[in-house]
Amino acid sequence: MSNPFAGNTDPISNALIPMVVEQTAKGERSYDIYSRLLKERVIFLTGPVEDHVANVIAAQLLFLESESPEKDIFIYINSPGGSISAGMAIYDTMQFIKPDVSTVCMGMAASMGAFLLASGAPGKRHCLPNAKVMIHQPLGGFQGQASDFEIHAKEILATKHRMNELLAFHTGKDIEIIAQDTDRDNFMRASEAVEYGIVDSVLTHRK
């Protein structure tokens, strides 16, 4: 099972990833901690949502589906958000596969991180007690010819509307309320995220 952080060439970051050694019939086998947790159907979304992160998470989701289509998958999220297209690649894969995907926010789920948190299976979306959630409208920047600005402005507005539609679906809120509440950065504590419908419960202890 490959290391989901294999693309990280930072020696300091790599040195901080613990290794787990297991005894097998064929002798010792070592895993980095993330690969070992993947065997337990646990995926981590940490840091910015970027294309290479989305590719790894989508691959992990598809792999776990092929292993056991009936067993839940768990995604732990601690992310400031990031690329909309990368986030939508993760979102679409979560909705496409057969297993329920349970989402858990630890630390912070902001922007696309909050969107993915809300898109977990109904009844299986959670926050840890001191986690925070932040929602806002998509951010866009463009440099180029003046004639192209209108094209990109229309695309940003269309993306904003689509994400508001999906967030309204997953939270049960009216789209008008979502549009109003995401007009500026909107921070929520764990209990407020439950009230808003982004998550279903706050987890304090494992049952």
UniProtKB/Swiss-Prot annotation:
It holds the Pfam family CLP_protease. Its EC number is 3.4.21.92. The keyword Hydrolase applies. Gene3D superfamilies: 2-enoyl-CoA Hydratase, Chain A, domain 1. Keywords: Cytoplasm, Hydrolase, Protease, Serine protease. It is found in: Cytoplasm. The active site is at 111 (nucleophile), 136. HAMAP family: ClpP (MF_00444). Fourteen ClpP subunits assemble into 2 heptameric rings which stack back to back to give a disk-like structure with a central cavity, resembling the structure of eukaryotic proteasomes. Cleaves peptides in various proteins in a process that requires ATP hydrolysis. Has a chymotrypsin-like activity. Plays a major role in the degradation of misfolded proteins. This is ATP-dependent Clp protease proteolytic subunit. It comes from Psychromonas ingrahamii (strain DSM 17664 / CCUG 51855 / 37).
